[in-house]
Amino acid sequence: MRMRNHFLTAVGLAALSVGLALPAIAEVTEQDILNDAKTTDDVVTYGLGPQAQRFSPIKTLNRDNIKGLVPAWSFSFGGEKQRGQESQALVKDGVLYVTGSYSRLYAVDARTGEKKWEYNARLPEGILPCCDVVNRGAALYKDKVYFGTLDAKLVALDQKTGKVVWRKDIDDFKSGYSYTAAPMIVKGKIITGVSGGEFGVVGRVEARDAETGEVVWKRPVIEGHMGELNGKPSTMTGKANESWPGDTWKFGGGATWLGGTYDPELNLIYFGTGNPGPWNSALRPGDNKWSASRLAINPDNGEIVWGFQTTPHDGWDYDGVNEFVPFDMQKDGKTVKAGATADRNGFFYVLDRTNGAFLSATPFVSNINWAKGIDENGRPIYDDANRPGDPAKSEDGKKGKSVYATPGFLGGKNWNPIAYSPDTRLFYVPSNEWGMDIWNEPVNYKKGAAYLGAGFTIKPTFEDHIGSLKAIDPATKKVVWEYKNKAPLWAGVLTTAGNLVFTGTPEGFLKAFDAKTGEEVWKFQVGTGVVASPITWEQDGEQWIGVAAGWGGAVPLWGGEVAKTTAGINQGGSFWAFRLPKALASR
């Protein structure tokens, strides 16, 4: 945590919302949200649809004409505030909404890049973001735009003016809570989680009335905690002490820091849950449910419908928060309502999304050694020789046995979202090849202090690359193609009906690949690392591509030896928009 304090002191400017008036904007409806994966003029959800497949049906741009894709404009986030820019933008009626580091939100003319308005949150001293001062995006609904802030607040703004409509506390930032994800809109409710898993917080998913900001329900994800519905206690999550000893469940982690997906047909929202607290697993024997899990939740009342734990009794910070992407899979001549997730533990899971039944788990990174495999029920077959030792059993009682474990704690895949193409039936997974030395240390919970109980050094697995973009067939469980990158990959992925896959690199490139073969067909240098998720939309009869740029995130803060591969990369803060001119579209 000491690594980050030097830039937190810059926080504390007064909230500011200034800019130009916007023309009339049609309200974003429930139907707009549900149809976002099919429509082309707008992008109104994080993930290009509630299922977050990040697939666009636009096929104007293809490998034959992509050489004509050129920059249209670049918008600077301004000021001295830089750090990581991990936001996915939204577009509605010619206005682009993009969040920036330090809890900022901008409305920009999508044709010209002219700023319409901006909102700068009032961030107090002492905020505790674990992994840089990032924000991953906003949500649109009716006439408002919503986003969360690093001091654990949820803000609703007027889309036209950027003026605050309401501002609500998610939780107490002094206890370690924060918020970095893009909210999700489901049936008139705004769905959020919490960040702060390294500080002994308790993860939860909650729903608020999108008009008023008032809480409708809360669902803690750690066993023993009581849910809430309409202001009253509802049901307990699991059973107290069933998989947590003593009072460890009170500070059990499981932060829901990445946001969720939604299946409207099944009426289920899917959330991943983070690492248990503390990292030192010797202090909490048991499965520690529902940390490091995927949960299906009823959006009407917050009840858990099913849960699947990818790393029970996690001892490596393998988290479990990565997105669960619904898709339909052909198996034995039948269509299976499936969902997939590329877990930080290095396995690519496919589950039945109706009931959480385990279908398959396949390694997607090299040299996994914390587990010997996954059994027929989806449970890891642990290699206990590669679990960090209990410091209480060491000679000095201060440091347990150190082990080398693969993947490293930043994961086979971290936050950066995968994409799925129904055309190729492939998932595109931004992964990293690294391991770590890790050991356990004594720790006690203290409000607002890091609750790790572990030390670590992360190291690259190979000399020639760390980053690896892989195309994975969920039916055959095979890697179809792979692109290797020298530095870690930290950007999200976009795929299109034009047989293209887009992602960014820390070296400053936005790149495009042939979706079937993995051949690199285009790249553009934006001058700083790309760690955001690209989008695409149609405007004036042309296809546009957009991405935020600005190096940062967890790698330079936590990356140890692998951070050396990015040591010379400049920070930045901007949004780049590219277009394929009509005259070049047919070439």
From Swiss-Prot:
Keyword Hydrolase: no
Induction profile: Not up-regulated in the presence of La(3+).
Traits of the deletion mutant: Cells lacking this gene are not affected for growth with ethanol, with or without exogenous La(3+), indicating that either XoxF-type MDH (in the presence of La(3+) or MxaFI-type MDH (in the absence of La(3+))) can support growth with ethanol as well. The triple mutant lacking mxaF, xoxF1 and xoxF2 can grow with ethanol only when exogenous La(3+) is added to the growth medium, and additional loss of exaF eliminates this growth. Deletion of exaF alone does not impact growth with methanol, with or without lanthanide, demonstrating that ExaF is not a primary methanol oxidation system.
Molecular function, one GO term: calcium ion binding
Positions with a binding annotation for La(3+): E198, N275, D317, D319
Record InterPro entries: ADHI, PQQ_b-propeller_rpt, PQQ_MeOH/EtOH_DH, PQQ_rpt_dom, Quinoprotein_ADH-like_sf, Quinoprotein_DH_CS
Function: Catalyzes the oxidation of ethanol to acetaldehyde or acetate, but only in the presence of lanthanides (Ln). Contributes to ethanol metabolism when La(3+) is present in the natural environment of the bacterium, allowing bacterial growth with ethanol as carbon and energy source. Exhibits relatively low methanol dehydrogenase activity. Is also capable of in vivo formaldehyde oxidation to formate during methanol growth.
Xref: NCBIfam families: PQQ_enz_alc_DH (TIGR03075)
Name this polypeptide is given: Lanthanide-dependent ethanol dehydrogenase
Annotated gene: exaF
